[in-house]
A protein has these predicted regions:
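Bacterial N-terminal signal peptides that target proteins for export
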Residues: 1-10
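Hydrophobic h-region of N-terminal signal peptides that target proteins for export
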Residues: 13-21
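Carbohydrate-active catalytic/glycan-binding domains of CAZyme proteins
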Residues: 24-332
Length: 332
């Protein structure tokens, strides 16, 4: 009798401890915007344009071509695509040019359009252009700067007259990341950046540098602010994680893993890692999409990636992911 009571007591305590330890994470994981899926099994935008990575997606429903996708390629050129209707596949897009010139960078972090002006951020420089993107090749100008040594591989978000920048901060010893994401603001998006919080996103709340983060993308969804960004640790390649806050001026809370590589398979383009997300709302789908850089290292399915800066059997392509949840009404 006593042993039964003791066992029941232990089970109750274990259950209570389990709830206390995991309750917050379990409730966080129920957030609908943590759920993402591949629209098809091989959700690759294109496999024939060599090393593709670090995409920037502009959605402008008022234009004849509402969708423009800039894909980083080499320091010499990026690629510019456009489409009248959204699709995960380049077969439904038009390649404007595969010799698209912004600057001389291997990658471009993020972009935003404000009051008719496009802004692109990379390497501490802010590029701007006004006019149709189809005519922008070679016409981007360096109009400003940002503190990339304190805030690198950034995501940019504009609201109520302020540019909000979130980027890598601190020294992560196991890869090209930060130990947190810092938050800066600017009224112009071109300079006079003010530090709001060096740890707006903190994957190491207990200190140290177990996790590295970077390459943020930011969106306001149903009244809350979401950041999706890379996270890695020693021996664990990039995955896309989700974070949420009810205010841009408050720290973001970890929700969980949003998009992960299929590391237990051998015949996919995303067996090794998934990173560099860029989020946008697609009105015709009534859902959000993310374009991400997917990397594979085993050469299966492989392809012609020679001369594009990759080594051995490495491949890098852009993959498109859809949010599980749709919006039944106009987003706010």
């Amino acid at each position: 009798m006593n042993s039964r009571i003791l066992i029941r007591g232990l089970l109750f305590v274990m259950s209570a401890v389990s709830f206390w330890v995991y309750g917050k994470e379990d409730s966080a994981e129920k957030d609908p915007w943590v759920g993402w899926h591949r629209p098809v099994d091989a959700n690759v935008f294109t496999t024939t344009k060599g090393n593709n990575h670090d995409s920037v997606l502009f959605v402008e429903p008022e234009l004849e071509y509402p969708y423009h996708l800039i894909i980083s390629h080499t320091p010499q050129y990026a690629h510019l695509w456009r489409s009248k209707k959204f699709s995960w596949s380049s077969a439904d897009w038009e390649l404007v040019t595969d010799q698209y010139k912004i600057g001389n960078f291997y990658e471009y972090d993020d972009g935003v359009k404000v009051d008719g002006v496009y802004y692109i951020y990379e390497g501490g420089k802010v590029y701007t252009y006004s006019g149709p993107l189809e005519k922008s090749n070679g016409k981007w100008k360096v109009s400003g700067s940002f503190p990339h040594k304190q805030c690198d591989d950034i995501g940019i978000f504009y609201e109520n007259g302020l540019f909000h920048m979130f980027g890598e901060h601190g020294n992560f010893p196991h890869g090209p990341d930060g130990t947190s994401l810092a938050h800066f603001t600017s009224k112009t998006g071109l300079g006079d950046w003010e530090l709001v919080n060096p740890k707006a996103v903190d994957p190491n709340p207990d200190g140290g540098h177990k996790y590295g983060v970077g390459d943020a993308t930011i969106e306001k969804i149903q009244g809350s602010y979401y950041i999706f960004c890379d996270r890695e640790s020693k021996g664990s390649p990039y995955k896309v994680t989700a974070w949420r806050s009810d205010s841009l001026s408050k720290p973001f809370q970890f929700l969980g893993l949003a998009i992960t590589p299929r590391s237990d398979e051998v015949d996919d383009w995303d067996n090794y890692r998934i990173q560099d997300p860029d989020i946008a709302y697609i009105p015709e789908l009534k859902r959000y999409v993310m374009t991400c850089n997917m990397m594979d290292k085993d050469g299966n399915p492989g392809g012609n990636f020679s001369g594009s800066g990759l080594k051995g059997k490495d491949t890098r392509v852009i993959g498109v992911f859809y949010s599980d949840k749709k919006l039944s009404q106009k987003r706010k």
